[in-house]
Amino acid sequence: MLTNSKQAVRLNEIAAQHKDRMDFYCIYIQEAHPEDGWQVQHNLDDDIVLNAPTTIEERAEIAEVCVLRLNMEMPMLLDDMTDQADGLYNALPERLYLIDEAGIVRFKTVAGAMGFKPEDWANAITELLGVPA
């Protein structure tokens, strides 16, 4: 679960700025740091204590918590329980992609919290659209 509310605000701003020219989606993938797996201190500090979902319904419930907690404005899609999207896009624990209308990956951040850089993503979007940053 994306936990940084400042980053979520920025993602919403970027999507709002370009929503007339492209579609934006967030895909909820497997939980990176579940309580019944590899829990990390910053999740405990932020009161993010979730078990890994075992059904698509449980995954949907956690995704809804993420949307509400972070005020995510873009549609939230769910990865399936085989983690197909995560596997195809090496998305765990979090990652930003820019995929053009032909399905070609035009930009991707480095996987993980240290590579999750909304400004780099925003710059790639403006470059692809040919608009000033």
Model-derived regions, located:
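Chalcogenol-based redox active-site neighborhoods
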Residues: 1-133
